[in-house]
């Protein structure tokens, strides 16, 4: 959880954060601070941590939180946009409300954009791991080395085990809306979902909350 929250806090589109903590939960402030520091070692992102159980009252906590938020907004509004190379751009791709045309039109267009970005030195992240069930061979053939391919296979097997443990399966993936709009099988949905990743080589496989470290 702390790694997930730290990812949100250190996202390039986030100027800063005010974190409200109860004080006795498992995800302690110290743990979140450590996770944020690992993703932002230079401390470029202002983060304010407030603990309810250390505050004199709930009203005082809310007042303090609002103060830090509005102070942060004033500071963020002074920031001006600066030019940046496309090699610094990282885009994560996600399906919208998928229908029978997603794999024919929308997703291939998204994949084409990702291929162009990668060719220019940027990075694309193909999300929704479970939706790739049934098209693993397509991704495996694009992995740059055996270690990357094995990690992909290992994570797919792990997702399958998690699904089995709760009495679910990847075949249950298509929603009623998907089926109504033409995606009648999980294989069709998976084939379309993979199109978002284009045809570029797979250089890295990430587990949940992990951060990309390589361009591509």
Label the model's feature ranges.
Residues 1-216:
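Metallocofactor- and cofactor-centric catalytic cores in central/energy metabolism, strongly enriched
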